[in-house]
Structures are given as structure tokens and as C-alpha cells.
Amino acid sequence: AEINNRKFQKTINDFFKLKVPSRLKISTNKNFYLAWMSPNEIMVITKNQDEIKTIKSSIENDLDQMEALVLDVSSSRTIFSIKGSFWRELLAKGSPINLFPSKFNSDSFRRTRLGQVSTAFWMIKEDEIYVLCGQSYKNFFFKWLCNAADEKSINKFF
């Protein structure tokens, strides 16, 4: 669906109690993350797997008359939690994203490549970030993260 559509925005707001995020942003509350993926795509992220089928069917019903596709991609994604004061330096090793605090902050969301893997990431708090990648790349990406985080190869920059 076109995310600027008023009906779409009302449906999302009513269901999740969150505004549809603007370009390159993420909206959050204690239950959900709504991430801007493209002009016609948002990603809903929840930690409660039991809610996924309910969310999917409710959104499909509410958007019935709109051109919209609602998919559950949870089985094909992995989320890594990276904690510590050097997460910006770590991600800068493999991503072209400007990670200076003035450009990437608590409501920022980016899709990019990290270590040759398609990823998306967002801040949870100042010293923690979530990185989402495809399930099939999780082992490679974990090894890349471990290698990039080696204490002998990381210096404070940000």
C-alpha cells in the first residue's frame, strides 16, 4: 500500500498505536517497531510471535479494498542485538551509512549492506542497536561481526 494514504495511516495508527514512520525512520512503543522500508512498504517487528497471525489477518481485513500485501517474513529473518559503546565503529567497518550521532539517532532506520549482507538496523538505546538480516546469512554475518569486533581492530571514532 502507499504509506501516505490516509486510510492506510489510520489503520496502522489504530492497530499499533503508532504513526507510520517517515522516510528512513522507525516508530516504536513497548510492543512494536514500525520501520520505513520504502515509499510503499513498512515492516512491523514484534517480539511476541503469538501476535503475528492476529496482526496479519487484522491488517489484511482493514486494508481489504486497498492494493496491499501483508506478509509474515519472521521465519526468514534474524535479529542481532549489538551492545556497547563501539557499535558505531563496528558498523562503520562494513557500511557506507553516515553513523555520526547527528545523522543516525534513536529514530533512525537504515537498510544497507554490512559485510556483503543485506541488512537493516536501528538504535534501541545509546549503547545498543538491532541489526536484521536474512536467516540464511546469519552464520556468515555472525562471524563477520565477531571478526569486525575484535578488540585489536577497533578504535573509538564516533
What spans do the regions from the language model cover?
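Basic, glycine/lysine-rich polyanion-binding surfaces/domains
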Residues: A1-F158
